[in-house]
From Swiss-Prot:
TM region positions: none
Family: Belongs to the UPF0337 (CsbD) family.
PANTHER family assigned: UPF0337 PROTEIN YJBJ
Extent of Basic and acidic residues compositional bias: 13-22
Name of the featured protein: UPF0337 protein BC_0999
Region (Disordered) residue spans: 1-22
């Protein structure tokens, strides 16, 4: 199991959650900049999470061949 893949997935989930909070606060306060930052953080989090999943699948595949 890829430890770095799992770490990347967790980091991505945290980034997504942070983005959701920022986006929500931006929505309530009508702060477009904060809302857009939140959307960007969510996007980065999603990408990190998917990269982590790919790393983990690759690592698991390599572990099975050994």
């Amino acid at each position: 199991m890829s430890e770095s893949g799992l770490k990347e997935q967790i980091t991505g989930k945290v980034e997504k959650a942070k983005g959701q909070v920022k986006e929500g606060i931006g929505e309530v306060t009508e702060d477009r900049k904060l809302k857009n930052e939140g959307k960007w953080d969510k996007t980065k989090g999603t990408i990190k999470e998917k990269v982590g999943k790919v790393k983990q699948k690759i690592s698991d595949g390599l572990d099975n061949k050994e």
